[in-house]
């Protein structure tokens, strides 16, 4: 309160993804008079990023991506600015934009998301080489595939799994190149991947494992082939790069904000600088499941962190208690769910049940008899039941010391094993 009147607070949010958009709307719920400014390097309001690949096969329209409409910010009195942030200057409490403008803040949330990793391959700037991170990327790919017959996907992770399904729908010849020994390395192990690889190959899709791109070749500045480390050359019209993401934090160099892989934040989503918060793909925060500060680049976690940051920026005292990462893919009749830690390591135990004949897999990761992760793959799995059950079992510390044998049963009763053994 200043001179008997409440000061109107200035909230500035960098990034319009799930963390930034959620935070903006949450701030408005708690502060109806505050000035909220959201800055994004995209010319779109909040949209469902995980569905953009469906534009390629026309499985959805562009309008379907805008879950809350295209006037979300106007309807909530949020100022939207399309621009790039060049610098954050904490001592002056303002940010500098690419166009030279400065914006003052009382509270700043950095939710700048990530960018696709692109290596310095020879020929990487040829026409026909794309990424699939944002809406503009997807629109460009959707336009190019109309006159294409072949596509090479560099990387075999979750985005690649979604992409091949859509490229197959429109009849493209597809080749996947993956550096690891198996597909979706973050979720699958070699045994599980074999089941999916078999089905993908049956669809006429080519897979190159333990391979790397060394060069893109072209004619008249247009992509014509991809050269691998082995010397093999693959003719193609389009290449899509899906080898990973990196947090957008370069603009914070020399700002004083503590960064490493991401932006270090405490359990309130606060950085080391007063009144500056971070959330989403850029936030590096201690997680009890991993017992170390980590990045959690998932949609659900970004929304959760954005909401917590917003509440604390408006005077609440809410803490982030960690999250259980959940990822899922669906491809050619298979569904897979990866929850928590899905790869065993030192001092961890693994219990797995794999049937190549029935094309079914279950893997559980235990630490001192407590469930810390699970991977489920099959043709008919109830993911709407499994996701919350497994997430709760991990979060609430389920001890399975007396029910390990049940994990190997074909007709497993997840509720019986996990929900009845939660430590409270």
Residue ranges and their predicted role:
Residues 2-12, 68-152, 227-233, 240-242, ...:
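FAD-binding core/adjacent interface of flavoenzyme oxidoreductases
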Residues 8-78, 164-187, 385:
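Beta1-alpha1 glycine-rich phosphate/pyrophosphate-binding loop at the start
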Residues 8-9, 16, 29, 282-384, ...:
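Mid-to-C-terminal Rossmann-like scaffold of FAD/NAD(P)H-dependent oxidoreductases
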Residues 13, 17-18, 43, 114-116, ...:
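Residue-level detector of alpha-helix initiation sites
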Residues 16, 39-41, 134, 156, ...:
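Cofactor-binding loop segments of dinucleotide-utilizing enzymes, especially the Rossmann-like FAD-
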Residues 33-35, 76-97, 103, 170-267:
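A Rossmann-like FAD-binding core segment of flavoenzymes
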Residues 125-146, 220-227, 232-308:
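FAD-site-proximal beta/loop scaffold in flavoenzymes
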Residues 397-424:
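Cysteine/selenocysteine-centered motifs that mediate thiol-based redox chemistry or coordinate metal-sulfur cofactors
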């Amino acid at each position: 309160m200043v001179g008997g009147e409440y000061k109107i607070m200035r909230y500035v949010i960098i990034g319009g993804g799930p963390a930034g958009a959620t935070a903006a709307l949450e701030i408005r719920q708690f502060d109806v008079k505050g000035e909220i400014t959201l800055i994004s390097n995209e010319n779109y309001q909040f949209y469902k990023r995980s569905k953009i690949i469906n534009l390629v096969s026309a499985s959805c329209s562009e309008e379907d991506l805008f879950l809350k409409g295209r006037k979300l910010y106007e309807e909530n009195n949020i100022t939207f600015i399309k621009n790039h942030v060049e610098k954050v200057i904490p001592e002056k409490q303002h940010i500098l934009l690419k166009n030279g403008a400065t914006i003052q803040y009382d509270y700043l949330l950095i939710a700048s998301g990530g960018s696709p990793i692109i290596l310095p391959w020879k020929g990487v700037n040829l026409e026909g080489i794309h990424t699939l991170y944002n809406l503009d990327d997807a629109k460009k790919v959707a336009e190019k595939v109309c006159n294409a017959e072949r596509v090479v996907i560099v990387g075999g992770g979750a985005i690649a799994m979604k992409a091949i399904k859509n490229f197959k729908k429109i009849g493209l010849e597809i080749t996947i190149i993956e550096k690891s020994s198996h597909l979706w390395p973050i979720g699958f192990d070699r045994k599980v991947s074999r089941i999916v690889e078999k089905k993908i190959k049956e669809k006429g899709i080519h897979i190159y494992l333990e391979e790397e791109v060394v060069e893109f070749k072209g004619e008249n500045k247009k992509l014509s082939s991809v050269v691998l480390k082995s010397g093999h050359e693959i003719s193609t019209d389009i290449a899509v790069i899906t080898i990973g993401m990196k947090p957008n934090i370069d603009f914070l160099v020399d700002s004083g904000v503590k960064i490493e892989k991401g932006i270090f934040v405490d359990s309130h989503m606060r950085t080391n600088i007063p009144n500056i918060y971070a959330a989403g793909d850029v936030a590096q925060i201690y997680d009890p499941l991993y017992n170390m500060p980590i990045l959690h680049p998932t949609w659900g976690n970004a929304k959760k962190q954005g909401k917590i940051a917003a509440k604390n920026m408006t005077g609440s005292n809410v803490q982030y208690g960690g999250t259980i990462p959940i990822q899922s893919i669906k491809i050619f009749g298979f569904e897979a769910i990866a929850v928590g830690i899905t790869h065993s390591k030192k001092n961890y135990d693994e219990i797995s049940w794999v049937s190549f004949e029935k094309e079914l897999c279950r893997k559980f990761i235990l630490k001192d008899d407590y469930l810390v992760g699970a991977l489920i793959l099959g043709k008919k799995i109830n993911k709407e039941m499994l996701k919350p059950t497994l997430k709760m079992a991990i979060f609430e510390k389920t001890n399975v010391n007396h029910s390990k044998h049940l994990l190997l049963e074909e007709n497993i009763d997840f509720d019986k094993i996990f929900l009845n053994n939660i430590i409270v």
